[in-house]
Design a protein with these regions (language model features):
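Non-globular targeting/processing and membrane-anchoring segments
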Residues: 1-17, 21, 25-28, 34-42, ...
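Short catalytic-loop micro-motif centered on adjacent basic/acidic residues
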Residues: 47-48
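Short hydrophobic beta-strand segments in globular cytosolic domains
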Residues: 80-81
Length: 122
């Protein structure tokens, strides 16, 4: 499977997916930390991919998404945006609605690793 196919499969397989630097327990940049905190505050399970552990995804995703920076949040297969957009949506109360609609029935405040090439997270 090509890296582009892997990315598309990850996006299609996860209702809420965050491509980030590090993981939710140990974000490796302030923007990833902020978005993780905002998602956790919404109380729905989300998947993540640590782009620092997967340089192929890190280099390919901006071409697939037409979005140059990280983190990148996908909800129901659509790119929502990066840190500034997610923060703005949160401040307007819109992020909660998006996350709730996508995450119905999921465990609260949990994250799982969507990158099958890495070991599963807690």
């Amino acid at each position: 499977m090509s890296t582009e196919e892997t990315i598309k499969q990850q996006i299609e397989s996860n209702n809420i997916l965050l491509y980030m630097k590090g993981n939710p327990e140990q974000p490796q940049c302030g923007f990833s930390a902020q978005v993780t905190q905002l998602l956790m505050s919404c109380g729905q399970r989300f998947a993540y991919v640590d782009i620092l552990s997967n340089p192929d995804i890190r280099s390919t995703l901006p071409k697939v998404s037409n979005w140059p920076t990280f983190p990148q949040l996908y909800i129901d297969g659509e790119l929502v945006g990066g840190c500034d957009i997610i923060t703005d949506l949160h401040e307007k109360g819109e992020l909660q609605a998006l996350v709730d609609a996508a995450g119905k029935g999921a465990d609260e405040n949990a994250a799982e690793n969507a990158d099958s090439s890495e070991s599963a997270a807690e």
